[in-house]
Regions:
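N-terminal phosphate-binding or glycine-rich loops at protein starts, especially the Walker A/P-loop
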Residues: 1-42
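Short, glycine-rich nucleotide/cofactor-binding loops
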Residues: 5-14, 143-153, 294-303
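Glycine-rich phosphate/diphosphate-binding loop of Rossmann-like nucleotide-binding domains
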Residues: 15-16, 31-33, 39-42, 145-207, ...
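Solvent-exposed alpha-helices and their adjacent loops that cap or buttress functional pockets
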Residues: 6, 25-26, 49-51, 74-78, ...
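A short, small-residue-rich loop immediately preceding and capping a beta-strand
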Residues: 5, 94-105, 109
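Phosphate/nucleotide-donor binding subsite
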Residues: 50-94
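Glycine-rich phosphate/nucleotide-binding loop
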Residues: 111-138, 218-222, 226-305
Length: 305
């Protein structure tokens, strides 16, 4: 397998990307194509003693910044790491493209360069989110801020297929994120989407799900627009960090708490491990003709690997 990697994407690029890429080559035996400013990449690798074995470098002179307007950037920055990387994927030079760069640019690029599967209007960004019973697939989690009912139905089909094939779950349950369980709740788009999902073949739609019930992990797939999904995802991350911090502070207040913390430390560590976004690597754009993976913008080496 050969994976194309955006060396310039993310808050910690190119160092974290280089470290993660080198670790992936060593541990998984994959071949990589690193796309980015070759001079900077080689300089960073030399300064930090990072081997470039198994990494073919493709030079680029431009970078799409987080503040750039996605569609304009994809069209104007032809020599950016994202555009070049996606074109390499389209040409068959690699099996997948991974980037921690701009979500919007990746979304537009996946649509315009890689293209979408027949019947899919826009790719959906999907990620597995840890929950009480079991992790669930959340889509869209940040690519399509506004969605029509038929788009949400397409997301449900793609999400159901993904969970079945990748997670091995038979007849996965699909729920629509809404502000109430009743069919009459929500915006006109959500009400129409609910009716459409009830008659969509190939999925097991179980109705609406309220935000308070999402973390229980009772359903396999949660469908929503990208704005709602991104709020759910980031709120989950924030609450997890807050609770872990509060637990630690509570345990360390007195001697009894410290003793209890020592006894429960392995369990707390396991929980922290489950809630760590670095453990989940990247999120695929479902519906693109070829695999395009979005890594967290703040990814460190572990997340990239």
């Amino acid at each position: 397998m050969k994976i194309i990697v955006d060396m310039m994407g993310g808050d910690n690029a190119p160092l974290a990307v280089l470290e993660g890429a080198a670790a992936a080559v060593k541990e998984y035996g994959v071949s990589l194509i690193g796309v980015g400013n070759e001079e900077l990449v080689r300089k960073t690798a030399a300064e930090h003693n990072i081997p470039l074995d198994g990494i073919e470098l493709v030079n680029c002179t431009e970078t799409i910044e987080m503040c750039d307007e996605p569609a304009r950037a994809i069209r104007s920055k032809k020599d950016s790491s994202i555009v070049v990387g996606l074109n390499l994927l389209k040409e068959g030079r690699g099996d997948a493209f991974v980037s921690a760069g701009s979500t919007g640019a990746l979304h537009v690029g996946a649509s315009l360069i890689v293209r979408t599967l027949k019947g899919v209007k826009r790719p959906a960004l999907a990620t597995m989110v840890p929950a009480k019973k079991q992790a669930y697939l959340l889509l869209d989690c940040g690519a399509n801020v506004e969605c029509r009912p038929e788009m949400l139905a397409a997301f449900a089909v793609m999400g159901s297929c993904y969970v079945n094939r990748v997670e091995g779950r038979t007849s996965p349950s699909v729920a629509l994120a809404n502000n109430g369980a009743e069919e009459s709740k929500g915006t006109p788009v959500l009400r129409e989407a609910h009716q459409l999902l009830k008659t969509t073949p190939g999925i097991r739609f179980v109705g609406n799900i309220e935000p308070r019930d999402v973390p229980n992990g009772e359903v396999d797939v949660v469908v929503c627009d990208g704005f709602t999904g991104n709020v759910i995802l980031k709120l989950t991350e924030g609450v997890a960090k807050m609770l872990l911090g509060m637990l630690k502070e509570m345990f360390l207040r007195n001697l009894g708490g410290k003793v209890a913390y020592l006894l429960l430390k392995s369990g707390v560590s396991d929980l922290k491990h489950q809630m760590d976004s670095e453990e989940y690597g990247g999120a695929p754009f479902l519906g693109a003709k070829q695999p395009v993976i979005k890594a967290h913008g703040s990814s460190k080496a572990k997340g990239i690997k």
